Amino acid sequence: MSPLTSATSAPNKAEILIEALPWIQQFAGTVVVVKYGGNAMVSDELRQAFTEDMVFLHHVGIKPVVVHGGGPQINSMLGKLGIESEFKGGLRVTTPEAMEVVRMVLAGQVGRELVGLINAHGPYAVGLSGEDGALLQAVRTGTVVDGVEVDLGQVGEVIGVNPGSILDLLDAGRIPVISTIAPEVGKASSVLNVNADTAAAALAVALQASRLVILTDVEGLYRNWPDKDSLISALSVKELRELLPSLASGMIPKMTACLKAVDGGVRRASVVDGRSPHSMLLEIFTTAGNGTQVFPEAGPQGEKA
């Protein structure tokens, strides 16, 4: 049940709406890129809440763009098919056999389900893969484990974005839902599995988004994990650069994505707790916000900091 349909008194409901007004005015007409993942993908309640949030953003004049991964669903399908899944340095090793499953699950299952849930509220969502219209371009990348370069197979890093198809959909009043599969630069017949956090950051920069919001399975960024009293509500890109080497491995891709987005001109980037229903709305439309927000050294006046 959403906050506005609970037993909250009428005056309190009115206060919630009035508090949201300046933020609606600030973000109306702008693009907000949302990376959807984690527990929010596997809980029916959280999936429903997320799709309601996207439709709400759409109806108050904001242009949401959804970027999704699908780690839990990929793991499940690989298990059903008896294909072993290997991780090195926290990243999935994607063999040609595994890549077929990744492609099938992201574009054919997760993306379609999300489009269907959004479209239960009206004909808004359109699903795309990073392959469509050469939306994303990627090159193969490895990782370093204990000082040794490791081959990850068909894993890539986004190096280019062709945003035209997304801009056309936004102009048509649609909500793009993007699966993070990308064609390999120089090899049109080869596709790569790209990290959804970094893909979302690249899209946010290319679309000149006002916000990047990444859903995660923790309350935000902690200065001294697992000390929950060390939760950081906001920090500058300078502070994040200094903190990045000391972060837990699971947060590094997310915070690196936030850093790249803000460095690329996105006004604000946030990680929010996707385990909490409607955390997106709290982050965008309340003064206190939700989670951890990254801002530039000298942000525009009148925005959340």
Curated annotation (Swiss-Prot):
Catalysed conversion reaction: N-acetyl-L-glutamate + ATP = N-acetyl-L-glutamyl 5-phosphate + ADP
Xref: Pfam families: AA_kinase
Principal cellular location given in the protein's record: cytoplasm
Organism domain of life: Bacteria
Annotated binding of substrate, by residue: G70, G71, R92, N193
Keywords per UniProt: Amino-acid biosynthesis, Arginine biosynthesis, ATP-binding, Cytoplasm, Kinase, Nucleotide-binding, Transferase
Gene Ontology terms, MF aspect: acetylglutamate kinase activity; ATP binding
The keyword Membrane appears for this protein: no
Entries under SUPFAM superfamilies matching the protein: Carbamate kinase-like
Pathway note: Amino-acid biosynthesis; L-arginine biosynthesis; N(2)-acetyl-L-ornithine from L-glutamate: step 2/4
GO biological process: arginine biosynthetic process via ornithine; L-arginine biosynthetic process
Cellular component, GO annotation: cytoplasm
Enzyme Commission number(s) from the entry: 2.7.2.8
Entry's localization field: Cytoplasm
Site keyed Transition state stabilizer: positions: K35, K254
PANTHER family membership: N-ACETYLGLUTAMATE SYNTHASE, N-ACETYLGLUTAMATE SYNTHASE, MITOCHONDRIAL
Family membership: Belongs to the acetylglutamate kinase family. ArgB subfamily.
Listed NCBIfam families: argB
Role played: Catalyzes the ATP-dependent phosphorylation of N-acetyl-L-glutamate.
Protein name per its UniProtKB record: Acetylglutamate kinase
Organism field: Renibacterium salmoninarum (strain ATCC 33209 / DSM 20767 / JCM 11484 / NBRC 15589 / NCIMB 2235)
